[in-house]
């Protein structure tokens, strides 16, 4: 909230329809300190709100304002490290398969035996939709580049992997390129970078085969910039997950978008309604003006007052032992989270 408040004076009194220009004003304002951390999140939040307002002023859905031909984007399912049991994991992917989703992503990295078993559970759940479902793995920068080559090659003896996500550090374009050239799966990365400047080395150095894009790339405007640059290099993009799939309108408008990450419903507790649903494996958007999301401020205040008994995981530290080669699983540690 403080970061958002610090940017209000930059755009106050200006025409909200000039979203791209207002985005540049905000990015230029934080030039010296750089577009990082809470400031990046604030710029992203304001940018999304401005795009929502621009579409509402035009009395049309945001996907149309952004230039999409139709209001839909292909979906894939992701467990995003919810620490599900084998049975819960199968139930989750099976529910997504029931609405036509034909691929999924799962966390890997700590234990090959568990990884292989759980990839199999994911594959079996999606086989009700497709005999060869799209299977993605995400090691969240836990492995070194050489470890990734070793482990991904082993996984590929058992499964056809569509892409391997973050198999090296986000900024290590040499390592990512090394992995890409030594495994069959496509290499995806970029979700933890902030803007087009940080993404450029990965793209220009042919370090990634697929780019993760999302609201974290400085909002809709920044994510579209990254995606357009990827288009020039024939690199497809995949949209990251977000509550109520609010980035789906941009995904629908990108000519090089392949699939958007979706998670099990339940993170929309602050919304009264949202104008999209999953059907036949696609996020289908309606025609309500703007994002089509109704936010309930009272629900937000009520959620802020809840004591969950623990602090949230943010800022999501890197797991102990990453890239050290010697980390064993501790007693009681969940080996797939």
Enumerate the language-model features and the residues they cover:
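Metal- or metallocofactor-binding catalytic centers and their adjacent structured scaffolds
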Residues: 1-57, 330, 334-337
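Conserved, mostly hydrophobic/aromatic
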Residues: 7, 46, 59, 122, ...
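Short glycine/serine/threonine/alanine-rich loop segments
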Residues: 13, 60, 185, 235, ...
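N-terminal small/glycine-rich loop or linker at the start of catalytic domains
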Residues: 58-81
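Active-site beta->alpha loop and helix N-cap motifs at the rims of alpha/beta catalytic domains
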Residues: 79-90, 112, 116
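Catalytic domains of carbohydrate-active enzymes, especially glycoside hydrolases
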Residues: 95-107
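Catalytic core of soluble alpha/beta enzymes
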Residues: 106-241
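Flexible C-terminal active-site loop/helix
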Residues: 242-337
